[in-house]
Amino acid sequence: MPATRKSAPLPSTVQSSFRKVAAAANALNAASDRFSRLVGEIDTLLKPLNIGIPCWVTVSNWSTENDRGEDQVGYAKINGKWCIGLRSVSDFSEQCEDWVFSEGPRRMRLKAVDYLAELLDELAKKTEEGTASITEKTSYLEDLVSGLKQEAIK
């Protein structure tokens, strides 16, 4: 049972507390919106590059009594759009939940921002690997087409 207070009447105290919570929430949401807009600017800069290669880096590992997994930040196609995103990957249940960055859990967004430079480095590496792979396959296709053309001429 709560202790009896001899201060302001309860409704007045509750109203004051609610005003504080509302003001703090407004400030938090404004800061979070600005934060997410800046990540959106990175998306805007990446979009015309037309990379089309998914890439993820681990932000943190987690475990519970029945599961373990990791939280990641990445560049991938989420909801039909290439963007910076977040995902939580479960090792045991093999489930994966992903979000567009601005829609992900706030705690994950805050952690993930420290890994954006690493993500860009990894994305550059995967893009270079993709280029090498395409170049190799293109050479193979050129040989294949050349052989087919020679056979067709006979």
Model feature map: region roles:
Residues P2-S63, E122-E151:
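Contiguous, amphipathic alpha-helical segments that mediate oligomerization or scaffolding
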Residues R5, R19, R34-R37, R68, ...:
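Arginine residue identity/basic-tract feature
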Residues V21, L38, I78, G85, ...:
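Generic signature of intrinsically disordered, low-complexity segments enriched in small/polar residues
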Residues G40-D98:
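Amphipathic, interaction-prone secondary-structure segments
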Residues E65, G69, E94-T131:
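N-terminal amphipathic/basic membrane-interacting segments and domains
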